Amino acid sequence: MEALHKKIREEGIVLSDQVLKVDAFLNHQIDPALMKAIGDEFARLFADAGVTKIVTIEASGIAPAVMAGLNMGVPVIFARKHQSLTLTENLLSATVYSFTKQVESTVAISPRHLNSTDNVLIIDDFLANGKASQALISIIKQAGATVAGLGIVIEKSFQGGRAELDAQGYRVESLARVESLAGGVVTFK
């Protein structure tokens, strides 16, 4: 997606060979026009998938997921990282390790919102080592639902998450595939 590539080149900051900071438009400050275009693209890519719901993890996946949900006319569910007083029933949950934050957390979804008739599109801001995607897949399977595919805004192809998802037979559509961050330069695949 050229508009996303351009935004990454102009406003992304390479912090190391492993970390790309995109807080100017995706995961702190949000560019609504870009999010709309991202949602439109995910809707186009998965138009044939029979998606009934979209699942993401709070917080950075919410903006692109909502835009895709709006375009596709389906609800968006976000897995919560922190349990609240209103989230009390037997939860669908999984543990996920955040590469960026270097912490492990439990993410959860209420079983009221996800069931065996759902065909679920996972949308997330990044795909690195695939741990967040695997956690969401686990939650979807706990509900007896099916995974329609994964829509990733930015994939760090050099970190192996996609290879694992491909090996498991999941459809992965990434809007920007970063091959390398070496030398402080973003190289797209």
UniProtKB/Swiss-Prot annotation:
Cysteine disulfide links: none
Entry GO terms, CC: cytoplasm
Reactions this protein catalyses: XMP + diphosphate = xanthine + 5-phospho-alpha-D-ribose 1-diphosphate
Localization: Cytoplasm
EC number per UniProt: 2.4.2.22
GO biological process: purine ribonucleoside salvage; xanthine metabolic process; XMP salvage
Residues annotated for xanthine binding in this entry: 20, 27, 156
UniProt enzyme class: transferase
InterPro entries: PRibTrfase_dom, PRTase-like, Pur/Pyrimidine_PRTase, Xanthine_PRibTrfase
Pathway the protein acts in: Purine metabolism; XMP biosynthesis via salvage pathway; XMP from xanthine: step 1/1
GO molecular function, one term: xanthine phosphoribosyltransferase activity
Sites where the protein binds 5-phospho-alpha-D-ribose 1-diphosphate: 128-132
Keywords, sorted A to Z: Cytoplasm, Glycosyltransferase, Purine salvage, Transferase
Top-level division of the source organism's lineage: Bacteria
Family label: Belongs to the purine/pyrimidine phosphoribosyltransferase family. Xpt subfamily.
Role played: Converts the preformed base xanthine, a product of nucleic acid breakdown, to xanthosine 5'-monophosphate (XMP), so it can be reused for RNA or DNA synthesis.
Description of how the protein assembles with itself and partners: Homodimer.
NCBIfam families on file: PRK09219.1 (NF006671), XPRTase (TIGR01744)
Descriptive protein name: Xanthine phosphoribosyltransferase
Protein's organism: Pseudomonas syringae pv. tomato (strain ATCC BAA-871 / DC3000)
